[in-house]
Structure formats: C-alpha cells, structure tokens
C-alpha cells in the first residue's frame, strides 16, 4: 500500500492502523513524506504484532523524534516479525544529532 506524500498526520495514521488490523495479508506499507509524529508512527509500527506477512515499512521523511525511533525499535525487538526493510530516515531526527 503506497500512501506516500498524502499529508497524513498522526491522527490519520492511528485511524489507518486501526483499519488495517484485519488486513493480515499486507506486505508493503509506504507512508514516507507525510506529517506523522511519534504517536502515529508507534501505532503503525504496532501492526507488526498482527501482520506477520509485512515485509517493508517506510516511515521515512516524517516528524518522528528520538523517542519515536527508540519506541519503534522496542516494538521491533519485542515482536516476532518478518520485516525485511524498515525506513525511518528523518530530517528532523538528523538535526538533533
């Protein structure tokens, strides 16, 4: 599913994550270049708990802060996932470093 550059904010990402919970065949989710902040990114990342076929998740070029990156990695560390590709490249995060 390609949702790149649709100006989706965190609230929209949360609704999307809730809507996709039953879509267990989802393999690719591209949400690059939206306006998603940490809370929305965490909701999307938690899809990995129920989507064992998700292979690629792109959350790059959003507004995910340092805590969000740590949270995403924590979810990945605690789930039994098959994710092969994760993009969390973030210009906001780069300015913090």
Residue ranges: model-predicted function:
Residues 1-97:
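Leucine-rich tandem repeat or coiled-coil scaffolds
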